[in-house]
Each structure stands twice: as structure tokens, then as C-alpha cells.
């Protein structure tokens, strides 16, 4: 455990270093810390011995270690802080008309990435927490059709497919009836379970050849079990992390899993400093913020960047964007659920 003065010294060094990326000497701290230069140097030496500070090769100053950043985050960082300038700037950026949920999510990830210079990712409600509330098949021609799946009465998913060659005219209606009878209204995990257990038995009752029918079921429904995730600023990873992290960001389902694992069920926000179990994220910082998606659940907004990022600034930005997201989505879903008639 460190003393209050040592904690103040560490906090100040973190703040100065994240703004200048230059090692900090004892003289730079004297105007804020009411102690002699010798006392400050002794405290800096103790912090170095504890592994919270480290020497710079080209300077007599000190800079925070990964452990020092982690200590700062755990003991001094206010995860609820907001900068008013960020708020007013981002309010203007959120003043746009959204035609679908994805427009709002993508805009949020782009803004967070643009304003930090790092990588931002945003996730929709976890698939397991969604329900299949609508299903239809629209035949486009004699050879292809479009399946329209609706989640939580508001999120559409469309899948275009070639009609199997052995299908008769009635078979698409039969398939639609099976879905309506057995899968509609069920949560996604139940849908997944029934596709593996109950549906194969039912298909045998209605179809002579079942293999391609079951393949079609899998093809239509596989999208239900994938995370909806938008990632912005991937190229920035080459600057703050390297090729391994950059390549990992293209594996969006693995990235989504790592983000979900960084936050417990009870937490609304968290910061992982070089602490991810995923090797590609083991040497970076992962900030994650949970935001409300009305009527449906929670989404996650994450910022991925270097260990020596400006934490106060990053936390402010992710908080502001998260709060504006909730407001924007509330208005969006309120509009979807309203009776909107325009009289001329």
C-alpha cells in the first residue's frame, strides 16, 4: 500500500506523461506536491521499487509502468467523469436521422475512434438475450427467395437463398409454418437448441428428402447466433499495438467474446490495463461501457488503445457517447413504436 502523497505523485506523473509522453522529473511535480525535491525523489524511488514507475533510458525522469497505470485506474480514475466540452461537441455529431439501428451504432464507434485515434468497437444486445418475434419468406423468383427474420419486434435480419431444386410450390409454406409453430416467440438459445433436436424430427414428417431442408434451416438461422459488432479505427492498432492485434480485430466474433468477458453482469463500466486473457489484447488497454438499448437490453461500447493512453479523456468520451447513444436509441425506438401519421 502506498501513502497519500505517493498516490498523488503517481497520479500526477500519469496525467503529465499521458499528455506529453515525456518522462517526468521531481522538479515538474514541486509546484503541485507540497514537499521538497528530495522528498519527492525518495517517494518516486519507492514507487519505482514497487514496480509502479520505471526509469527512462534517455532521462533522469520516471514514467508509469503498466502496473502503475493499472494502480491509477483501480484507485484514482473516476469511471463516471464527463468533460462538458466533449459533451457539447458530441451532441452536434449525434444530430442526424437514423434509418436503422446499425446507423446509430456505427456512428458511435466512428466518433469514439476519430476523437481518440484508437480502435472502437460496439456490440448490439447479446444474441442469447434476443427473441425471434417475426418470420416470413418472400419468393423473389422461381429459383430464389428472401427469408425475413425479426428479433425483439424491431431488428430485421434478411437472408437470400436459392430454393432447393427438389422443393415443390408448397414446401416454402411448410417451412414457414414449422418456424411459426415451433420457433416463433422463442429466445435465440432455444431456437438453437430446437434446430438441433426438435426440428429434424418434424422435417421428417413433411419432407421425403430432409438433408437439404435441414441445411437450409441452418443457412437461414446461422446469423441469429452471431454478434452484431462494428469496429472502427482498425489501422490505428498498427501504431499502438502491432500486427497481431491488428489481425485479431478482423476476427470480429472473437473480439466480441473478449469484450463481453471483460465486463461482469453487474458492472456498467470497466477498464482492463494489459489484463486480457486474449493474447492479442494482452498488452493493450480495453475500456468497456454498457449502454441501454430500449425494450431490448444492453449494448457494449469499447475503446482499445495503448496502456499509456490519456485515461481521463478516454473515460469522458466513452461516457458521453454512451449516454448520447441511450438518448438517441430511446428516440429511435419511441418513433418505431408510435403511430406516426403526417397530415398535409
UniProtKB/Swiss-Prot annotation:
Gene3D superfamilies: 3.30.450.40, Heat-inducible transcription repressor hrca homolog, domain 3 (3.30.390.60), Winged helix-like DNA-binding domain superfamily/Winged helix DNA-binding domain (1.10.10.10). One of its GO terms (molecular function) is DNA binding. SUPFAM superfamilies: GAF domain-like, Winged helix' DNA-binding domain. This is Heat-inducible transcription repressor HrcA. The keyword Repressor applies. NCBIfam families: hrcA. It comes from the Bacteria. It comes from Streptococcus equi subsp. zooepidemicus (strain MGCS10565).
